[in-house]
Amino acid sequence: MKHLPFLLCLMSFLGCKAADFRSVDAETFAKVIEDTTVVRLDVRTANEYAQGHIPNALLIDVTQANFMQKAEQLLPKDKTIALYCRSGRRSKNAAMQLAQHGYQVVELNTGFNSWKGEVER
């Protein structure tokens, strides 16, 4: 009986599923977004987005408190979400949040800085 709290804690931990997402390089990311069903998502600020972004990318700033609320309003759960930020740090945060909410996510691990493809302004 004295081990019950430990066992309950262990069971709750084992019941948690880690949020999974794919983190890929720029070349692989470019191949992923060739699929027109993939949703492109820029998680940088509006100012960064205005300076240039991957064509047809939606903008949801991950630094805003309502990031997940906006994501759930705009992003379909039945489509893959391909997301990026400037360098890869914010996108990992966004990818983890989205994956925890049931989204299938592919993240550009080196960010927009490494993007060699087309840029829309």
Where are these regions (language model features)?
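Structural scaffold elements adjacent to functional motifs in cytosolic proteins
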Residues: 40-42
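Intrinsically disordered, low-complexity boundary segments flanking structured domains
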Residues: 10-11, 45-47
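Rhodanese-like catalytic fold shared by cysteine-dependent sulfurtransferases
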Residues: 3, 16-32, 38, 47-80, ...
